[in-house]
A protein has these predicted regions:
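Hydrophobic/aromatic packing residues within the alpha-helices of TPR/SEL1-like helical repeat arrays
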Residues: 20, 58, 62-65, 98, ...
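Hydrophobic positions within repeat-based interaction scaffolds
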Residues: 14-17, 52-55, 132, 139, ...
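Conserved alpha-helical positions within TPR/SEL1-like repeat arrays
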Residues: 1-9, 20, 32-47, 72-87, ...
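A detector of tandem-repeat and repeat-rich interaction/domain scaffolds
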Residues: 52-55, 59, 90-95, 102
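Short coil/turn linkers that connect adjacent helices within long alpha-helical scaffolds
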Residues: 27-31, 64-70, 106-110, 143-150, ...
């Protein structure tokens, strides 16, 4: 079942990649839709772990956005490059691109992008084991977050970072806050982390409950993705941030 599921997803990404490559051939080189096609194509490559084509495509998107003087296009491509390098554990390159993206977001005073990029930077520091610096960045993400967005992902990352800092009570507080409005994907990670915390604290009964809930979330995710059709996949990739 695991092999069939991943084979299905791989085929859908191949179809999406082919669709975006076809769209590039007919897209006008001086209009905004081409930037979205580039970025969605890069994301498809990234999702298939084709990192060199992803980087090449994001750079093409960046160059096109520069010619068009489209700051949001430049911002999206720059953050995309940071994401690809972060996935490959090339932290210094990732941080360099994230800092460039953050400067652009601050210049256009877009707090939604600022929140997202501060979270990106926090994750890199967290992966490096620099938990105090990660906490500073996630606090900035919360400070700059617009009042009308769902903060569940940010709360989750703050809880995870606090867990790594061994501030267990504070970690549980933020993870619990994250769970109230989280989507199924974030909930799976939240309950998995709460399971690990309770297991370490020898609260085995509570740990089992969290583990069962996490497994239920993972099962639901598998069913959702397994039944995803190509048009839904393309819609997912059309989200700009």
């Amino acid at each position: 079942m695991f092999h069939i599921y991943h084979s299905y997803v791989a085929k859908e990404y191949i179809k999406a990649t082919e669709a975006y490559l076809t769209a590039l051939k007919t897209a006008s080189p001086n209009q905004a839709p081409i930037l979205q096609i580039y970025n969605n194509l890069a994301l498809c490559y990234e999702s298939q772990e084709f990192y060199l084509p992803a980087i090449k495509t994001y750079k093409e998107s960046y160059a096109t956005a520069e010619k068009m003087q489209d700051k949001y296009g430049i911002l999206h491509a720059t953050r995309g490059l940071g994401n690809v390098y972060a996935i490959q554990d090339e932290e210094e390159k990732a941080l360099s691109y994230y800092q460039k993206a953050l400067s652009i977001a601050q210049s256009i005073k877009d707090s939604l992008w600022e929140n997202a990029i501060f979270c990106d930077i926090a994750k890199v520091y967290d992966d490096q084991g620099l938990y105090i610096e990660a906490k500073k960045q996630i606090d900035l993400a919360l400070r700059y977050a617009p009042s009308n967005i769902n903060l569940s992902p940010t709360y989750f990352w703050k809880g995870s970072i606090l867990y790594n800092l061994e501030e267990t009570d504070s970690a549980i507080h933020y993870l619990s806050r994250a769970s109230t409005k989280a989507n199924i994907y974030t909930k799976a990670s939240i309950y998995q982390t709460l399971y690990e915390i309770n297991k370490e604290n020898k609260n085995y009964e509570q740990a089992i409950l969290y583990n069962d809930t996490a497994l239920t979330c993972y099962d639901s995710i598998q069913k959702i993705i397994h039944h995803t059709e190509i048009n839904n996949l393309i819609k997912k990739h059309s989200i700009y941030i």
